[in-house]
């Protein structure tokens, strides 16, 4: 959940910079740990099976989770090293995704850097990964489609496609 990162502001914080134009051309990047997904789970056993697979893949005995309501967006991995955003990768097929770092750096709600002293104080290593969904709110989606119509552009079918288009 990247919202936690906003408690570690820097002079390069996202609310202090202007958005930029996304760039074209993406390089394939293999995820250090696969980005597995959870299909609908209707029982504790299905959820426990997911946990077992995550622990096997990660090589960890214990894994902490953060659960939120389901968002329909583009799954992303953000890698920070020494407190700086160094790579943003789409989920892709789960093993390999697309490096969309330049485009993600134009999204104002994504911190480009977090203060390492504050990370240390919170027990967070200087190098860490954040995984989540790039989403577009219904209101932003409707406003975007209105702009598309006025400019003679093509309307997006749904917020997920619009979010993916903004990142890619």
Residue ranges, per PLM feature:
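RNA/tRNA-interacting regions in translation and RNA-turnover enzymes
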Residues: 7-168
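Short, exposed "boundary/linker" segments that immediately precede the start
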Residues: 1-6
């Amino acid at each position: 959940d990247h919202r936690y990162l906003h408690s570690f502001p820097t002079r390069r914080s996202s609310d202090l910079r202007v958005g930029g134009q996304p760039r074209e051309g993406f390089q394939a990047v293999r995820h250090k740990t696969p980005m597995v997904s959870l299909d609908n789970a209707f029982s504790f056993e299905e959820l426990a099976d997911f946990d077992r697979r995550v622990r096997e893949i990660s090589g960890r005995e214990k894994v902490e989770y953060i659960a939120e309501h389901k968002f329909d967006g583009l799954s992303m991995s953000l890698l920070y090293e020494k407190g700086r955003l160094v790579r943003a990768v789409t989920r892709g097929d789960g093993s390999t995704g697309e490096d969309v770092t330049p485009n993600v750096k134009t999204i104002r709600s994504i911190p480009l850097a977090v203060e390492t002293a504050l990370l240390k104080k919170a027990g967070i290593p200087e190098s860490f990964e954040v995984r989540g969904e790039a989403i577009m709110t219904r209101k932003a989606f409707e406003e975007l489609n209105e702009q598309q119509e006025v400019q003679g552009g093509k309307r997006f079918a749904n917020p997920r496609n619009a979010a993916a288009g903004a990142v890619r």
